[in-house]
Amino acid sequence: MLGTWVLMLMVPSLSVAAERYALIVTGANGEASYAAQYEQWRQTAVTTLVDRLKFDPARVQTLFDGGDAEHTSNAAGVRRAVDAVRARMTADDLLLVLLIGHGSFDGTEAKFNLVGPDLSAAEWAALLKPLRGKVVLVNTTAASFPFLEHVSGPRRIVITATDSIAQRFDTVFPEYFIKALADPSADIDKNGRVSIWEAFLSASMGVRRYYTQRGQLATERSLLDDNGDGQGREAGGEGTDGSAASRTYLAPDVPGAPDTDDELLALLQKRAALQIDADDLKDRRQLMTPDEYAKEFERLMIELAKVSREIRKKQKT
């Protein structure tokens, strides 16, 4: 399929609309149980992009452990796939890179585990740097945090499943991120499309619920960087990241859809952050005195009520 994909990329397009590309890589499987899970996530991602978000199937490339010579998730396959996009990509185009599998950190470098030699965060950054269009890199693996620093830059949105090199356990972030891409409930501003920020927010909240429902401490905290400083921001945290991601969509334009209301979007994001804070407070309840918990709970509920009231006012205008 890669050969056909490369030929297609060499033919000039008659369309002036921005093109959307995707590269989905599931790395070295390891145990058989991982192979089944990674295949499920990969297939779900492809189905979501093609059937729900209307990507051209010829522009969705997959690499995986056990694939044929053109689809094996090794370093050579990754380089071929990125080179194929680079040959065609314009400044108006978008590429989604979704990494699913195992990640590692050896004390010096963070790597995404491939079949054969791995590629480090720095090597991924070098591969993607020549691309002229917008790149959304989502590394859903453990120890993915260093990718934030290396890949971030102008016209780059980087999401990592972890916020520390110490987070080396298997992640559930891909389950919730892939689901959020076309989930109407993730569309918090109700404009008919799920932005990258909204998918990140929905996935982050899903991960928190996963651990809370099991009575476990979360071993992963996702970050998003879209301002190029390599610092990143949690879904419920403070920071300047999120503006570009809030205006970046994988879905095609929706005819007649309202423009993004910056003030409403800020309020919606604030409400989501407060809801995350409320969930965190419940997790910490056993570590607090009853008075401390009651006081903090009351403060959050008052803030939530104020923000919700402002949202209703904006939605009526």
Predicted regions and their residues:
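Active-site-proximal beta-strand/loop segments in catalytic clefts of secreted hydrolases
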Residues: 25-29, 63-67, 98-102, 115-116, ...
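Active-site-proximal C-terminal subdomain of hydrolase catalytic domains
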Residues: 136-226
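Bacterial N-terminal signal peptides
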Residues: 1-13
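Caspase-like (clan CD) cysteine peptidase catalytic core
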Residues: 81-100, 105-149
